[in-house]
C-alpha cells in the first residue's frame, strides 16, 4: 500500500511538471480554444475561476466567440473561434516553469471594444508594465503586443489584468493568442560592436498573423523584448518577420510605424577620438506602405537623413554614417521623419524598415 502511494505521488509530480513545462510558442490553451462548460457560464460571463483550462480567472471575465455582436459592433477574433474579454479589474493568470535568471518575452493579441482609454497591466512578479492600447496600429482593430521579463525563480505567474474602471463593467479589452519565447541576449563581436544589429533575437511572432508585433516604449518596459535595443519614444515600433513581410536581411527587421514618435536606440562603448562607421539598410515591408520616406540615423552628435522612395512592394538600400566618437559611450538611434499609412486601407500605420545595422571602427581617411 505504501509503495502504491509513492507511485501515485510520482505520477502527480510528473503530471504537474509536464503541465507547466515551457516551450517557445503559445502557452497551454493560449488561444482559448478550450473553453468553459455551459454550467460555468452566465451568458458570456465565466463564473468559475478555473473554468477555462490552464487559466485562473479573477473578476468579470467573458468568453467571446468570433462574430459576437456588441451593440452595432461585431467582435472578430484574429485567429481561431474564441477570445476572452477582461472587464473592470479582471485578470487571467497562468503559471509556467522557467529558468531562474533567464529572459523571456510574452506576446499577445489585444483589441479595444469601447471608446475609453483602455490599458492592460502585464506582470510577472516583481516586474510589470501598464500598456496603453488606445492607439490602434492595424485596420482589423487587433494588435500584437510584446513584453519581457527576467525570471526571479523557477516558476512565473503570468498575469494580464485590466486596471480600468468604466461605467460598463463589460467594457474591456479582448485578449487572444498568448505566447512566450526565451530570449538569449547577444553580445558584441569583432564583426559588429552593436548587439542584435540584425534584430534576429526578439519576441515570438504568431504564425499566420501578418500584423507584426508591437514593441512598447522603453519607459514602460524594464527588459526589452528586442534584446540590445531600447524603444525611446512615445509610440511602439513594430517587429516584423520574413514569413509575412519583405525583410532586407535574415528573418527579422524593425518597422518604424509612428514617425518621430517611434524610435529605437542602443548605447555602445566607443573610444574617444576613434573613427567609426555606422551602416544599415532602409527599405519597405512590402505591405502597401508607399511614398516618400526618410529615416534619420544618429550616432552621438552626428546624424544623417536617408531618403527612400517606397512603392510598397519591398526593396531596400544601404546607407552609412561616418563619425568620430567624442565619449566612451555613444548612442545610436533611428526614427522616421514622417508618418505613413498603408495605401490599401488608409487606417493602418506603417513606415520604413531598418535592418542589418552594423557599427565598426575605421581608419581615418
Curated annotation (Swiss-Prot):
Effects seen without this gene: Decreased PME3 activity in leaves associated with empty short siliques missing seeds or with heterogeneous seeds, as well as several morphological and developmental defects, such as abnormal carpel morphology, decreased stigma size, septum with engrossed regions and badly differentiated ovules tissues. Misshapen embryos with modified methyl esterification status of homogalacturonans in seeds and associated with abnormal radical and embryo bending.
Induction record: By auxin (IAA and NPA) and gibberellic acid (GA) during germination and in roots. Highly and early up-regulated in roots during root-knot nematode Meloidogyne incognita infection.
Main location: secreted
Glycosylation sites: 48, 121, 208
InterPro entries per record: DGR2-like_dom (IPR006946), Galactose-bd-like_sf (IPR008979), Pectin_Meth_Modulator (IPR052437)
Keywords: Auxin signaling pathway, Cell wall, Developmental protein, Glycoprotein, Secreted, Signal
GO cellular component, one term: extracellular region
Gene Ontology biological process: auxin-activated signaling pathway; embryo development ending in seed dormancy; embryonic morphogenesis; gravitropism; pectin biosynthetic process; positive regulation of seed germination; regulation of auxin polar transport; regulation of cell wall pectin metabolic process
Subcellular location(s) per record: Secreted, Cell wall
Signal peptide per UniProt: 1-21
UniProt entry tagged with the keyword Ribosomal protein: no
Tissues/organs with expression: Mainly expressed in vascular tissues of roots, leaves, stamens and petals.
PANTHER family for this protein: GENOME ASSEMBLY, CHROMOSOME: A01, OS02G0527500 PROTEIN-RELATED
Role according to the record: Together with At5g11420, acts as a positive regulator of PME3 activity during several developmental processes, including reproductive organ development, hypocotyls elongation, seed germination and endosperm (testa) rupture at the micropyle, probably by modulating the pectin methylation status in cell walls. Involved in the regulation of pectin methylation degree to modulate cell wall physiology during cell separation, hypocotyl growth and embryo development.
Other known facts: 'BIIDXI' means seed in the Zapotec language.
Oligomeric and partner information: Interacts with PME3.
Designated name of the protein: Protein BIIDXI
The organism's taxonomic lineage, starting at the top: Eukaryota, Viridiplantae, Streptophyta, Embryophyta, Tracheophyta
